[in-house]
Design a protein with these regions (language model features):
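Glycine/charged-rich beta-loop-alpha catalytic/anionic-binding loops adjacent to active sites
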Residues: 31-37, 246-257
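Charged C-terminal helix
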Residues: 294-327
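A short, basic/flexible loop-to-alpha-helix module at the beginning of a structural domain
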Residues: 17-33
């Protein structure tokens, strides 16, 4: 198969320093950038915790977790900095308007969103992702949101999907699995609003391709996905690839310590925080991968390749970002 013509490169230390967010002396939490994370399900509350910890350590001014009420007592002691939006229970097919009304209160003030870590692979998760991205039936009068600003009143945001705010969204894990069940979902979304972060299995479901083809031709598949979906793609693997269909970046280093549950949740939270601070889709994805690889190598020096767990990564990523800030 033939790749379309595009620019190919690597994202190195100089690129990382150049893209790193910088805070002004008068910054406050909302000017830095808040991120809303829609994550967690029974048995997967840790995904929400890891994603939120990573977002905070990567510089988000505020982290808001959209979760179900029963998970809050488990999450709050571990991530006391987070605030919460309580998701409604029950069949969202009949309550999607209530969901959007609930989420809108905090979403209107956030600069980026993360959807998917640990949401579960069930009808509720699929309905949730569909409603949040505006793919399901929309309330009368809701549009694709051109011209909305953070200064608008809360009432101006009632019933809007996350896309209505014209802010970037990371779709990860079960968010990707939900999209894979919706025919032609991409034609209903604006271009270059999402960073999709699949591993090989999730990409197989998104593209309806066998995993062996993705492993054999990862660059072609990543580019094809970016062009089909008209979004930015971060295909995890060896190498990890970042592309918007016009440029392709390869992260050649692949620390074996990252082969651990939760590392993808950390990456999603890191990218969400970087997007909230104003980075482009491609720069946020690249810097998230770069810092995550550096953090893993730092941890391997002390813990080896076997002893690193995902909970070690957020602080190590913060240390790597601090080193870039001093460079």
């Amino acid at each position: 198969m033939t790749e379309p013509e595009l620019t190919i490169g690597q994202f190195g230390p100089a690129d990382a320093v150049k893209s790193l967010p910088r805070r002004s002396a008068g910054a406050h939490k909302w000017s830095v950038g808040g991120v809303m994370i829609v994550a967690g399900a029974p048995g997967y509350v840790g995904a929400a915790i890891l994603c939120a910890m990573a977002a905070g350590r990567a510089g988000a001014g505020l982290v808001n977790l959209a979760v179900h009420r029963p998970w809050i007592p488990s999450i709050a002691p571990v991530v006391p900095e987070a605030s919460f939006t309580i998701l409604p229970d029950g069949d969202l097919g009949s309550t999607s308007s209530r969901l959007l009304d609930t989420v809108s209160v905090k979403a209107a003030k956030c600069a980026a969103f993360v959807v998917g870590p640990g949401l579960g692979d069930d009808d509720y998760a699929r309905q949730l992702v569909s409603a949040l991205l505006g793919i399901s039936a929309r309330r009368q009068g809701a549009s694709l949101g051109f011209g909305s600003t953070q200064a608008q009143s809360a009432n101006d945001h009632v019933g809007k999907s996350l896309l209505d705010y014209e802010r970037p969204i990371v779709v990860d894990a079960d968010g990707l699995n939900a999209l894979a069940t919706i025919d032609d979902w991409w034609v209903r979304l604006p271009e270059q609003r999402l960073v999709l972060t699949p591993h090989v299995g999730e990409m197989s479901r998104l593209m309806d391709l066998p995993t062996n083809q993705i492993i054999a031709e990862p660059e072609w598949v990543a580019i094809a996905a970016a062009n089909r979906f008209r979004q930015s793609i971060l295909l995890k693997g060896n190498p990890t690839l970042v592309t918007d269909g016009r440029t392709l970046f390869r992260a050649i280093d692949s620390p074996p310590s990252l082969a651990t549950a939760g590392s993808g949740d950390v990456l999603a939270g890191t990218i969400g925080a970087l997007l909230a601070q104003g980075l482009s889709l491609i720069d946020a994805a690249n810097l998230g991968v770069f810092a995550g690889i550096r953090a893993a190598r730092r941890l391997e020096a002390d813990l080896g390749t076997l002893g690193v767990i995902a909970g070690d990564l957020p602080r190590a990523i913060a240390i790597e970002l601090a080193a870039l800030e001093r460079a």
